[in-house]
Amino acid sequence: MIKSTVVYRDDGLPLCSSVDDDISDLSLNEQKKRIKMVVSRMTPQSANEATLESKDSEIHYIRQQGVIYFVICEAGYPRNLAFSYLNDVAVEFQHSYSNELSKPTIRPYAFASFDTFLQRTKKAYSDKKVQDNLDQLNQELVGVKQIMSKNIEDLLYRGDSLEKMDDMSNSLKISSKKYRKSAQKINFDLLISQYAPIVMVAFFFVFLFWWVFLR
């Protein structure tokens, strides 16, 4: 289950965050504090994607074009699905705001309206069909280590550096090519889940217009 999404600029400025977080989840604020600490310690040499493990949750992140996208998930939520979600978020965020990201006048959480997309995408990634397809993909890739893992306690409190994960990221890039085609199918299923109702409504009105005025 996806619990929360946070987007930072790589200089530490928070850009947006999901707003439907479970207020009864006492650990969520602690996880967000840890994300803030991770952002403050990142350098240009730090890994561009990784998983940070912490108790009953996992924090996944990707860094693209000066922006860092974090998602907090329940432990055991499929990592491939979490990273596919992050990539979808990154593509849409860059498409929507790329011309504004470098402006020095941007205020914290300036793109709060992006939450609408976050909620729609989060719902799509809860679709059972998508998760089933991912399980099948994982079975085909048994033995392939795809995402780096790092205990967040080691990372934040024992002095380990994010730069140490950089070598592992190179092997990640190589192995990721092996499942790209299967991931594309998953993304197609996500699009169907998100937009099929809209297409059906539009088709109904087109048919109604044809029936009334053109038939």
From Swiss-Prot:
The chain crosses the membrane at residues 194-214. Residues 215 are vesicular. Signal peptide: none annotated. It holds the Pfam family Longin. Residues 6-118 form the Longin domain. Keywords: Coiled coil, Endoplasmic reticulum, ER-Golgi transport, Golgi apparatus, Membrane, Protein transport, Transmembrane, Transmembrane helix, Transport. It comes from the Eukaryota. GO terms for biological process: endoplasmic reticulum to Golgi vesicle-mediated transport; intracellular protein transport; retrograde vesicle-mediated transport, Golgi to endoplasmic reticulum; vesicle fusion with Golgi apparatus. One of its GO terms (molecular function) is SNAP receptor activity. It is a single-pass type IV membrane protein. This is Protein transport protein SEC22. It comes from Candida glabrata (strain ATCC 2001 / BCRC 20586 / JCM 3761 / NBRC 0622 / NRRL Y-65 / CBS 138).
